[in-house]
């Protein structure tokens, strides 16, 4: 049963496949039923594992890769639970990022953005975030 279903989904782009598999698992495994509290805890656990691997550095690239995939899968499960379109949510986030950079470039110039210290940059970023 699983083999056939998983095989049918394997031709989808990875995020779409993850979303569909997450949906499928909630229909075939009672233990996989998602609720917000469970998913929040699961996300915290996966992010903690991911950050642990990131702190290990570049030599741990394979584990970073694996843990990032786990984080993304939990995010897909949360998206399914709340009927959030992952593509549109990502597009919105990217558009906001571009808008903030364009605001900063227009107000301060590209050189200021390039040469700002991390502290300076995040002060400017906070300003840009407040502008809609």
Predicted regions and their residues:
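Flexible "arm" and connector segments at domain edges
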Residues: 1-68, 73-132
